[in-house]
Amino acid sequence: MGGSKSVTRFFVTSVGMGNGGNLGGLAGADAHCQSLASAEGAGDHTWRAYLSARATESEPATNARDRIGSGPWYNAEGLLVAANIENLHSSENRIRKETAVSERFDVVNGVGDVPNVHDILTGSRPDGTAFTGSGDLTCGNWTSSNDGRAQVGHHDRMGQGESANSWNSAHPSSGCSQQALQSTGGAGLFYCFAID
């Protein structure tokens, strides 16, 4: 690449990891982002999954917004999706079905497509922070395909109710198994952002 980095700095994973909400923790999700990006010539960036993790007895909470660098972020076509963290978590970001494409520049199915897979795993509140309290909305901090649920966003910004327009915090899944994620319109996909 002659010293220049690839333009892609944001994508939706083209495939999940196939085990529901068990992504191998944050490290496993990050590795999946890195692997997918590398396969498409964007491995020259350091990639992080946009996922929050709740606090445990031994670890503080991890906020998705604090894991992904400071922007700007462009999709595989070179279109700006967000200039910075504040822009990303405002109504001014450009995350839509047309821009929230996979690392292969494929459109990710949304409402009206078969199958609809617009539920994108985040475990996050609208401001990109982890949920507090006793309820698990991170599938055991992304290590379980059994217990808990996952908070998801809608990459196409469509669905029923006002929160359905949220790209990162639309509703919780019905469970953490692959089947449970599919039942509400998901496939275990998540967002990946380049931190550099």
Predicted regions and their residues:
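Secreted/extracellular ectodomain signature
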Residues: 1-196
